[in-house]
Structure formats: structure tokens, C-alpha cells
């Protein structure tokens, strides 16, 4: 209740660009990234396959986080199985479709292809097969990464809270979403005093 009154809780879903502008009128740049948190391994083999993340080599749940340039978390998607890709999760939740076209989005290479949905999306260029990146492409990647570090700091701020950084053993439905939402709200509340 208190965090809701202080307007520090991020939104789980934005339904239109107008709603985004109404909630965050001063956000001109946003930064998107995925967050993975480890969970307890299921006993059932099918459930194990569903939650196993090849990237982290453990069983995880995954969400997409959108923050502004002040490290404040604006949007947190629902947690899905760790096997899913960041882009697929963002597409399912319509994260990029519901951002206004005049807002610049900085993301990592996991979101390649989102430029078709949102025109002002800046993503580092991958090295093409068989050749190297040019010096100007490398410099552009460095610039994009220097902007993107903001969302990494925001994720680090969320992971200060042990309910996010430790392995989740609670099997109640949607408890991981609540933990992530509350940790994001506490991080935003902390930022309002610094």
C-alpha cells in the first residue's frame, strides 16, 4: 500500500503508448534487459526441461526489465520459464509495441529484430560470420554499451534484495512475480532518496 501511494512500484504491463506517456512523461530514453533468477529443480523431468536455462546452466525463471536513465525501473514483465529467450518474452508481453515511437530504446543483442517494431531501438551489431567488425561499428557498439550499463545497474540494485538473489524455493503461484515487483519498488524507493 505504501509503495503504491509513493508511486514507486513499476508496472507489470503497459497497454498502449499513451498509457506509457501518462505514467512516465519525462522518460525519453529507456533501457531493456532480461533478468534471470535461479529456482529449485523440479522432480518431474518435463518440468525440469521447461525451466532449465542453457545460459546459466541451472533452473531459472526469467523476466524483462525496462528502466529509465536514472536507474528507475519502469516495467517488469511476468516471470516465465528460464528456457525462453528474452526477445520471445518481450514479444509475448508486447513491451516494445507499447512504447511511444519518440522514446529511444537501448537493448542488448538478445533483442535483435525489435527495430522492425520500434524504430528508435539501438542494439549493438553482431560480428558477421567470416569477417570482423569495422572500427566505426566497434565504436558504435561501445557507445551503445556505455548507455546500456544503466539497466545493468538497475538489475544489480534489485538483486541487492535476497528474495531475488537467492534460489527461490517457494512454489506458490505468482510469488516470484510479487517478489520481483516488490524488490523493484524498494529499489525505486531507495533511488528517490539518493
Predicted feature residues:
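Short, well-ordered secondary-structure "scaffold" segments embedded in the functional core
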Residues: 1, 7-194
Amino acid at each position: 500500500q505504501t509503495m503504491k501511494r509513493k508511486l514507486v512500484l513499476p508496472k507489470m504491463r503497459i497497454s498502449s503508448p499513451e498509457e506509457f506517456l501518462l505514467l512516465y512523461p519525462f522518460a525519453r530514453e529507456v533501457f531493456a534487459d532480461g533478468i534471470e533468477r535461479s529456482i529449485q529443480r523440479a522432480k518431474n523431468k518435463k518440468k525440469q526441461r521447461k525451466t532449465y536455462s542453457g545460459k546459466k546452466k541451472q533452473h531459472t525463471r526469467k523476466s524483462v526489465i525496462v528502466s529509465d536513465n536514472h536507474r528507475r525501473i519502469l516495467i517488469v514483465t511476468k516471470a516465465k520459464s528460464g528456457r525462453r529467450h528474452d526477445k520471445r518474452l518481450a514479444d509475448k508481453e508486447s513491451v516494445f509495441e507499447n512504447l511511444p515511437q519518440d522514446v529511444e530504446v537501448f537493448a542488448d543483442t538478445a533483442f535483435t529484430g525489435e527495430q522492425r517494431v520500434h524504430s528508435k531501438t539501438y542494439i549493438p551489431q553482431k560480428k558477421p560470420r567470416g569477417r570482423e567488425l569495422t572500427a566505426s561499428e566497434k565504436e558504435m557498439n561501445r557507445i551503445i554499451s556505455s548507455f546500456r550499463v544503466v539497466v545493468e545497474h538497475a538489475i544489480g540494485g534489485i538483486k541487492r534484495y535476497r528474495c531475488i538473489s537467492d534460489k527461490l524455493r517457494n512454489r506458490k503461484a505468482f510469488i516470484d512475480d510479487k517478489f520481483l515487483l516488490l524488490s523493484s519498488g524498494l529499489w525505486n524507493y531507495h533511488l528517490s532518496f539518493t
